[in-house]
């Protein structure tokens, strides 16, 4: 059944210039522009929103858990450009054509809500956070002062307070921002400001060579942040990891001492709780001991692994996180709050964030307002306009409760454990290692390679398998799964369970489909 208006009649939204002109005689013109009444057809606009919402409901929401739908309908870029009609013209298009464009966008977009989308560290559909997104898009708020965003500022404060509690701090501060990469940049800049407050006004001149330490398995945003902030990528010291991808504390101690002997100024250690590929958790207590001994700021990038704090069973993975000075935590990942929903949390409660980032814009942050201006939190952010991302997490948390969020984490990790055991049973599948979290890394070895000795030729051929299977699954639309080479290991698959819509049957299908797509290689 078509969701588009009947094209035989005059479609909604097709407004003639005559219809736009007010019927009254006393038309007011300024620079040739009619100022009487609104310049848009409100009724037609409302009808377009109604039709578009129905399209979203029927084509996205209702099909989100349908395994008979394709995960993606792959088209190469040049073909997709033609199908979407991307050209922007002088004249606008009628609403029936815009709805067709919307339908095309849905059709050719990757269905990240699909139960068989395993490509990234986000997936699935949380209905409550989706409603929250609809609301905030319609209200179009910007979160910087209480006067323009009273509800969302209070919501953000409540969510941050609860997240701080789960980290184990008695009090703290924080801000929601556009991504874990930005959180890591916040941490790097804040640690530098704490080390040398004068840098805010005087800049980098006169400072010693600043150096920071992070895991060799850290997120690539650490290099980007160092470049962006003028610290320099050469001053990011990547500390060796063990075979499971965890930072080795003894190596960290050694590198800090070496840097000091060279005359550099160590100021920050970034540990990782849940690395992107292997899902490794650095030993936080041992790292915190080193930071305390040398007076270094400890930041924990828990963008991926922070959600384990919600689980009484799995929070042990982040043992020692309460000793961190700052934490990055992304509820849009395993807690499914919708991209993007990312918190930067700070143990300090002395307004360090505000002192570091404030610019005291007089048109926003007047101190003689008629209400308590401590609720005007926008000067803690590097942004001015800022989305109310905390609301998505808040509404989902209100709906599910802490116990519901805990169950979400526990179920995801239980399904991951099921997949691990199935991989061990199946011929042609080989685990990289026993997983610590939800990242299941494995090779698929096609029949043609199963009798080969594991020498250079074997690994060279196996390196080609995962990309070829990925191409086949994308073009078929049956599945999406990530792969990568890593630390000297040839291409392997990384599977991550997040969505509660995923079932045991989907785990079985994953392995069956990989075998089906790759057995002739």
From Swiss-Prot:
PROSITE patterns: DDC_GAD_HDC_YDC (PS00392)
Enzyme class: lyase
Tissue: Expressed at highest levels in skeletal muscles. Also detected heart, spleen and rumen.
Comp. bias regions, Basic and acidic residues: 1-12
Key words, A-Z: Decarboxylase, Lyase, Pyridoxal phosphate
Subunit (UniProt): Homodimer.
UniProt-recorded name of the protein: Acidic amino acid decarboxylase GADL1
Organism of this sequence: Bos taurus
